[in-house]
């Protein structure tokens, strides 16, 4: 398996620290609003990579944080007349709701920065003690000149970084720094801000130190994979490298991975530009399989343009795949022979070439676009060569293979007609009973839960009917 490593700017053979195990940290959302579809791409990409690593037999410890103390959160809390904690609680709940609908698996650990304040204070104190940080009137800055490798992740020279930082220096706070490139790892309290007691007075952590501390505390001094959106490469991830390696003296992460932007009209989607669509808005119109297919139709390091036309195209592609599955499932009731004959055994063995090709594509820096092509080739083959004269065993094994290769991509796992019919009919009956009892809240919940699973109900004069949607 080869991974493109941002640190070395080339593909490298993936060799985990501990054989069979992967320690992976992904920078999660700042929880002051619903996440937009650009953020969603990052979450879907690294969920897919995590799924594929598990498919290949790795035990993945997957950590994705919540930034729940930040300038944006303080601003939001002040605007709404509430507390930063209440804002964080609300949008963490909303994150889980949207992520679940996108079939994003829950992380092994979802740490909140505010749960690690004491650890962060200790981290900052050690950096001061080692001479890598200094305190000025309650603020603490990291001394970038003391860290000789500053700039190695983003590939920028010290001269370029200094020039850029000098151009940005404008505030009194900046003028107190020893160098324009120095960045805050602890911020003194301002009126109306939450704060914690520390040796430098009341204050709160800087953004960059939060991830360094949580990654170290949960995964150790050196982790296998650190990942996030491409926009985090500098300064966020660069600063994480500096802080962490200054403290421990060892490499922070062996592989750095970054997903590219989602653009609208060739401009990066972002809240600051107000050119974004929330994942929640998109999910009102498109199924999670469609959104995931759209995201994976391009390599994760390539930017993609967002448009309704492209989503509609993804929807049509997903429908083709589900139709292929549906055709096979319908055959289960039509075929009369149970077990495979010798010719079918040979044919089934020939289908292994699709699994091998799929693994070859995904092992090459998680090439999801080519992996999707393999899925289409497989479904075309099975739909051409499996028919009413085939055995039930062959039909089921072909279905198993299609779903097996869809699973790491988070695709093709929804209920289709012909499977779990008893469960659906039972839920429909429960809904009917609830309506008779005027328990419309329960009735609506059952309907919405089924819709989330890809099943839509239709109330007709002949009774309730259900069908699969994509």
Curated annotation (Swiss-Prot):
A UniProt-annotated Pfam family: DALR_2
GO molecular function: ATP binding; cysteine-tRNA ligase activity; zinc ion binding
GO cellular component: cytosol
InterPro entries from the UniProt entry: Cys-tRNA-ligase, Cys-tRNA-synt_Ia_DALR, Cys-tRNA/MSH_ligase, CysS_C, Rossmann-like_a/b/a_fold, tRNA-synt_1_cat_dom, tRNAsynth_Ia_anticodon-bd
GO terms, biological process: cysteinyl-tRNA aminoacylation
EC number: 6.1.1.16
Places the protein is found: Cytoplasm
Residues holding Zn(2+): 27, 211, 236, 240
Motif 'HIGH' region positions after renumbering to this chain: 29-39
Reactions that this protein is recorded to catalyse: tRNA(Cys) + L-cysteine + ATP = L-cysteinyl-tRNA(Cys) + AMP + diphosphate
The UniProt record lists the keyword ATP-binding: yes
Cofactor(s) demanded: Zn(2+)
SUPFAM superfamilies from the UniProt entry: Anticodon-binding domain of a subclass of class I aminoacyl-tRNA synthetases (SSF47323), Nucleotidylyl transferase (SSF52374)
Transmembrane portions of the chain: none
Intervals of motif 'KMSKS' region: 268-272
Cofactor binding annotation: Binds 1 zinc ion per subunit.
Keyword Ribosomal protein part of the UniProt annotation: no
UniProt subunit comment: Monomer.
Family note: Belongs to the class-I aminoacyl-tRNA synthetase family.
Matching NCBIfam families: cysS (TIGR00435)
Name under which the protein is recorded: Cysteine--tRNA ligase
Organism the protein comes from: Clostridium botulinum (strain Alaska E43 / Type E3)
Lineage: Bacteria, Bacillati, Bacillota, Clostridia, Eubacteriales
GN (gene name): cysS
């Amino acid at each position: 398996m080869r991974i493109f490593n941002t640190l070395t700017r080339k593909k490298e053979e993936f060799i985990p620290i501990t054989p069979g195990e992967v320690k992976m940290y992904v920078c999660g959302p700042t929880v002051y609003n619903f996440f937009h579809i650009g953020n969603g791409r990052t979450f879907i990409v690294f969920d897919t990579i995590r799924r594929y690593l598990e498919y290949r037999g790795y035990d993945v410890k997957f950590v994705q944080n919540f930034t729940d103390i930040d300038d944006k959160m303080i601003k939001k809390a002040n605007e709404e007349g509430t507390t930063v904690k209440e804002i964080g609680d609300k949008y963490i709940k909303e994150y889980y709701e949207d992520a679940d609908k996108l079939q994003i698996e829950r992380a092994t650990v979802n740490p909140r920065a505010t749960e690690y304040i004491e650890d962060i204070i200790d981290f900052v104190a050690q950096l001061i003690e080692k001479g890598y940080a200094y305190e000025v009137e309650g603020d603490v800055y990291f001394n970038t000149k003391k860290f000789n490798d500053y700039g190695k992740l983003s590939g920028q020279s010290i001269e370029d970084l200094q020039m850029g930082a000098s151009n940005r220096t404008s505030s009194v706070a900046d003028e107190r720094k020893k160098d324009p490139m120095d960045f805050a790892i602890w911020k003194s309290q301002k009126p109306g801000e939450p704060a914690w007691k520390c040796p430098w007075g009341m204050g709160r952590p800087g953004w960059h130190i939060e991830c360094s501390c949580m990654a170290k505390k949960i995964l150790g001094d050196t982790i296998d994979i650190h990942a996030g959106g491409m926009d985090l490469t500098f300064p966020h991830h660069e600063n994480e490298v500096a802080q962490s390696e200054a403290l421990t003296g060892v490499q922070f992460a062996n592989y750095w991975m970054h997903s590219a932007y989602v653009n609208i009209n060739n401009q990066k989607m972002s809240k600051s530009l107000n050119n974004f669509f929330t994942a929640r808005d998109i999910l009102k119109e498109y199924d999670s399989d469609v959104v995931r297919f759209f995201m994976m139709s391009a390599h994760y390091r390539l930017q993609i343009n967002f448009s309704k036309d492209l989503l509609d195209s993804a929807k049509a592609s997903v429908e083709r795949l589900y139709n292929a599955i549906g055709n096979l499932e319908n055959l289960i009731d039509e075929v009369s022979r149970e077990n495979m004959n010798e010719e079918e055994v040979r044919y089934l063995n020939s289908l292994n070439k699709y699994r091998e090709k799929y693994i070859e594509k995904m092992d090459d820096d998680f090439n999801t676009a080519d992996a999707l092509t393999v899925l289409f080739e497989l479904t075309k083959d099975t739909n051409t060569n499996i028919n009413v004269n085939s055995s039930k065993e062959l039909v089921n094994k072909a279905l198993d293979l299609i779903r097996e290769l869809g699973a790491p991509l988070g695709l093709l796992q929804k209920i289709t007609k012909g499977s779990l019919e008893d469960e659906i009919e039972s839920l429909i009956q429960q809904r009917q009973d609830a309506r008779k009892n005027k328990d419309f809240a329960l009735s609506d919940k059952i309907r919405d839960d089924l819709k989330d699973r890809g099943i839509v109900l239709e109330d007709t004069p002949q009774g309730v009917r259900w069908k699969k949607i994509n």
